């Protein structure tokens, strides 16, 4: 599943291609993948709420899109130049639509295909005024950039008996951190992922929040991570893992800070990477 930096990269890329273009027709090939009544209108802008994209039209309607695990957005303009984002596959270069195409959005300048192999993603039409009240979006906590260190510390103390890693993965506590960026943020802040939230000091909470901001800023700047289920809006891969990742998927390699061997184990069912020396329990 793409994480916040990947979805932000997609938002920026697609904004260049479809903002000010007019949506003229919608073809629904899978009822499960489309919620609401199809609508036409000119794209005003594209917003992001956590890992969801919202395309605002000039008719007071919006399209909320969630790629989930294997969703793709592939835009073909009239010159047949193709821009693609999401789960990488031959669909990026193959003829479209195909057996994985769930929804087709036809614009005056080209066509946007929503493909989804596993049918977990969706497009939902709703009034623009109601977007922020949608149950999926309403439950999201503030993102790291929009949360104070004091508020973050208070939230952690409300879950004092929970381990820190699954707590910061909870989108109702802090929005945007997925598995990659949780590991990287905890490493940067010298915090073991199994520590109970009640043991985290105010200083440590502030350091962790700052680390999360820095990690995600770097990832957005580099176009996101390179994972098997994600590529950028122009079809190329992000290079955060290659350029900046210090522990994620680096098990067996030396810690860039102290030289100890990075190890991998599971926390709350999630693969977790740490330096056992820098992040002692």
Task: Give the positions of each predicted feature.
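Generic detection of long, well-ordered alpha-helical segments
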Residues: 1-4, 95, 146, 201-209
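A cross-family signal for N-terminal binding/gating loops and helix N-caps
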Residues: 1-115, 120, 254, 270-281
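Low-complexity, intrinsically disordered regions enriched in charged/polar residues
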Residues: 4, 63, 134, 146, ...
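Short acidic/polar alpha-helix capping motifs at helix-coil junctions
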Residues: 4-8, 15-18, 131-132, 220, ...
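Basic, nucleic-acid-binding surfaces and adjacent catalytic neighborhoods in DNA/RNA-processing proteins
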Residues: 22-38, 42, 73, 81, ...
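Short, glycine- and charge-enriched coil/turn segments that flank and shape catalytic ligand pockets
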Residues: 58-60, 131-132, 203, 260
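Phosphate/anion-contacting hairpin/loop surfaces
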Residues: 63-176, 181-188
């Amino acid at each position: 599943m793409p994480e916040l930096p990947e979805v932000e990269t997609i938002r920026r890329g697609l904004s260049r291609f479809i903002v000010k273009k007019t949506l003229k027709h919608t073809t629904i090939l899978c009822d499960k993948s489309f919620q609401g009544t199809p609508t036409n209108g000119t794209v005003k802008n594209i917003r992001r709420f956590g890992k969801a994209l919202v395309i605002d039209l000039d008719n007071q309607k919006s399209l909320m899109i969630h790629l989930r695990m294997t969703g793709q957005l592939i835009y073909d303009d009239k010159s047949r130049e193709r821009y693609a984002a999401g789960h990488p596959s031959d669909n990026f270069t193959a003829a479209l639509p195909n057996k994985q195409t769930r929804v087709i959005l036809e614009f005056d300048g080209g066509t946007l295909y929503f493909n989804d192999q596993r049918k977990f993603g969706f497009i939902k039409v709703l009034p623009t005024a109601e977007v922020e009240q949608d149950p999926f979006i309403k439950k999201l906590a503030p993102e790291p950039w929009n949360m104070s260190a004091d508020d973050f510390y208070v939230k952690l103390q409300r879950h004092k008996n929970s381990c820190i890693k699954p707590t910061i993965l909870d989108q109702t506590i802090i929005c945007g951190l997925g598995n990659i960026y949780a590991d990287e943020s905890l490493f940067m802040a010298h915090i073991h992922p199994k520590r109970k939230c009640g043991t985290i000091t105010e200083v440590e909470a502030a350091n962790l929040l700052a680390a999360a901001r820095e990690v995600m800023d770097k990832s957005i700047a580099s176009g996101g991570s390179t994972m098997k289920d994600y590529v950028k809006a122009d079809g190329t891969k992000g290079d955060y893992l290659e350029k900046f990742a210090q522990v994620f998927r680096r098990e067996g390699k030396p810690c860039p800070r102290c030289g100890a061997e990075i190890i991998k184990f599971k926390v709350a069912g999630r693969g977790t990477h740490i330096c056992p020396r820098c992040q002692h329990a």
